[in-house]
């Protein structure tokens, strides 16, 4: 069975989305990134939070809008929600809880990664002991407010081990393993 990975681009002050979930800031940091390009080929399924699924898209208004990794990845997607849409969405399975979502995504991913998208879903995976790796692409910008990479008020320390550190002109990539 593959591993569970949370990947996100984050501002230097710790935000993955701006105020109100705004993702437009991300556009200028989406240049070529060999670390992400390599990762995309190793993703077998996505586990997506409902707010991420229904939220802002850095590719809004383009042909890449609504496509994971700007159209760079296709495959099974599992969205955590208590309110699935009435009309089915092709390629997307809506699940009502984390355990069933993780089980379905892991089965679909096989030996590849289940890539988690969404801060709240990543936090839930971490708290459940299901998160294995974290890839943070750190952008050289300060957003000042928004959605944090991890929001864990009153949470305990979680030890991480640095697996790799790479960079592009746009971002610095930090790949971490959750130490158990």
Regions found by a protein language model. Give the residues of each.
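Enzymes that bind and transform nitrogen-containing heteroaromatic metabolites
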Residues: 1-180
């Amino acid at each position: 069975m593959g591993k569970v990975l949370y990947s996100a681009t984050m501002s230097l002050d710790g935000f993955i989305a701006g105020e109100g979930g705004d993702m437009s800031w991300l556009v200028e940091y989406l240049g070529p990134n060999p670390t992400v390009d390599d990762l995309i080929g190793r993703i077998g399924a996505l586990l997506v939070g409902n707010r991420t699924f229904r939220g802002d898209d850095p590719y809004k208004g383009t042909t890449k809008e609504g496509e994971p990794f700007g159209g760079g990845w296709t495959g099974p997607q599992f969205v955590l929600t208590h309110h699935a849409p009435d009309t089915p969405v092709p390629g997307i399975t809506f699940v009502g809880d984390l355990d069933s979502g993780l089980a379905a995504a892991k089965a679909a991913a096989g030996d590849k990664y289940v890539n988690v998208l969404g801060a709240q879903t990543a936090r839930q995976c971490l708290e459940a002991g299901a998160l294995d790796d974290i890839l943070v692409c750190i952008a050289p910008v300060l957003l000042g407010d928004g959605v944090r990479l991890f929001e864990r008020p009153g949470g305990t320390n979680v030890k991480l081990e640095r697996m790799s550190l790479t960079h592009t002109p746009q971002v610095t990539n930090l790949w971490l393993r959750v130490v158990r």
